Regions:
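N-terminal auxiliary segments of SAM/dcSAM-dependent transferases
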Residues: 1-24, 34
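S-adenosylmethionine/decaboxylated-SAM
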Residues: 39, 43-221
Length: 221
């Protein structure tokens, strides 16, 4: 199988199952025009996140890594009327684009975009948060995902979902000798989860327009 096939199948899935969406298209276009990297989740992946949040009946969602707000919009649309989503983004320009996209989507009342280092933002949020998050989506620097996961665990409850994107690294995750910080972060996370009796977890390998990677899904016991 080749990237061309993966991309073509993604296009087929979008054509068959994902109706045209002016708001999401505008979000991608605004991010591109602002020079943001085109590393947001694909439309089928965004729909998958949306469906998981619906199945979860999530009322509180935490997202670590906003980029231009594309996945944020997918997730926030799954929230009930009284739902809230907190998303964290280290890059000020990315956060500004995300806020604009979220406002265009009519979701500003439900979504808070926090701009800053997630290490600091999470530490503050842990002190402030009284109610657990029903779902957390981690799509930020992979070297730090063990820290992000532990913080998310402290703000979760039994039945909460924690999802971590880009955990296969085009297969590099199996290289125990890798010196790549992202690969090392993912491997450390996997080892942590494997030892952690608080969660049940798996990894789904993914292919598509975004290439070959994977999504970790952890259910808090």
């Amino acid at each position: 199988m080749t990237q061309d096939i993966w991309t073509s199948v993604d296009s087929y899935i979008v054509e068959m199952l994902l109706p045209a969406d002016d708001v999401l298209d505008a979000a991608v276009r605004a991010a591109d025009e602002a020079g943001l990297p085109s590393i947001q989740v694909s439309p089928p992946q965004g729909k998958f996140l949306h469906m998981l949040a619906k199945v979860q009946r999530a009322r509180r969602i935490l997202e670590i890594g906003t980029l231009g707000g594309y996945s944020t919009i997918w997730l926030a649309r799954a929230l009930p009327a009284d739902g809230t989503l907190i998303t964290m983004e280290i890059d000020r320009r990315h956060a500004e684009v995300a806020r604009s996209n979220i406002e265009r989507a009519g979701l500003s009342a439900k979504v808070s975009v926090l701009n800053g280092d997630a290490h600091d933002l999470l530490a503050s949020l842990e002190k402030e948060t009284g109610e657990a998050f029903d779902m957390t989506f981690i799509d930020a620097d992979k070297a730090s995902i063990p820290f992000y996961f532990e913080s998310a665990m402290r703000m979760s409850r039994a039945g909460s979902l924690i999802l971590i994107d880009n955990v296969v690294r085009e297969g590099a995750v199996i290289d125990a000798a890798s010196e790549d910080a992202s690969v090392r972060g993912v491997r450390e996370l996997n080892e942590m989860i494997a030892r952690d009796a608080r969660v049940s977890a798996t990894v789904l390998q993914t292919v598509g327009v975004k290439g070959y990677d994977g999504l970790a899904i952890a259910l808090v016991n």
